Structure formats: C-alpha cells, structure tokens
Amino acid sequence: MVQTSRQTRSSGRRRKPTNNRLLLVVDQSSSSKRAVEYVATVLASRRGFQLCLAHFLSQLPPEMLEFGGAEDPEREQQLDRQLKTEQQQWIATARKGAQPSLNWACARLHKAGLPASSLTTQFSDPFRAQNSVSEEILELARTNKCRTIVVGRRSLSWLRRLTAGKDLAEQLVQQGSGFTLWIVE
C-alpha cells in the first residue's frame, strides 16, 4: 500500500500522513531480529513515531484449559482455584522466557534514537482460539491504533503450527486490508 499526502479542502495545503504508529511483532527468531533491525534503521533518530512491540506467547496446553469438574461443589472450587494458579504460573514463566527478546528489541530501537517513551510492549493472550494469531495481530493493531504492522518473514515453529503451516506474513497479507504491512525477509 502506498500512502500519499492529501490536500485539505479549506487551505489547499498538504497534510502529512498520520501513519506514525507501528505494531512490531517480536519473538526469538532471527527473522524477528531482522525486522527489529530494519525498523531501527528506517526510523533512526526520527521523532513522532510510536511503536507497540508485541510478543506472542504459545497457547496454554490443553490440559491447562479445564480440569473436567467434580461432583462436590467444594472440590470443584478447589480444583478451579488450583487450575487458575497453574495457569498464572505458566503465563508468568512464558512471559519471563519472552522478556529477553522484548528487552533486546527495546534496547536496539532506543540505541537507534527512538525515545523510550515511544515504545510500549505487550504479550498476546495465551487463551486465544486455535489458528487466530493473524486475527489477534490485526486486533492488537486496531486496539493500539497502529496502521502499520511489521513482521519477520519467518516465525517460530510453534507459531507456524498455529497458522496451519501457512506463513504468518501470508495470512496477514490476505486478512490485513486497511493496514500497511512491512514484511521483513
């Protein structure tokens, strides 16, 4: 998609495009690192950009989604509390494992001249439905008012499994109408 300047009706002056919010998908893959490097190079020392760095956690294992129930209501509540505790521990461990790649990306972008105040980070929802990673990326972009999405061409193997063997980038191209996509080789 090529973005062009538009003229305002009242003044006849050109307005600058407002595509200054980017969603950058980050993981531990070399492709993701190349995407971060590309963004750092393109936006080096430029002001006015906001970047949301999103790390996609793998889905919770099926055995952590539900416990099967119990006839005794007290036992049911106990099992429910135990399951929620285990889920929270799993998510905390997954986030801890993902944090180094987010920290590296933030440090690299900051080194390129992007102020820390222009960077935000977030994690995906590990409770998401099967095969909805591209939809979740698009929803994150909408929620964060990002009109540009940046992804590496190849993602981690577990992410490829979630996208039914298709490249995440391919799915975004098919579903990402209205967004500018930067797919970094």
Predicted regions and their residues:
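A conditional alpha-helix N-cap/helix-loop micro-motif detector
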Residues: 32, 130-131, 165
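Short glycine/proline- and acidic residue-enriched helix-loop micro-motifs
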Residues: 81-93, 119-123
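Small/aliphatic-rich secondary-structure junction motif
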Residues: 13-86
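Structural beta-alpha unit
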Residues: 1-12, 17, 96, 104-148
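Gly/Ser-rich helix-loop-strand patches that form or flank binding pockets
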Residues: 1-12, 136-185
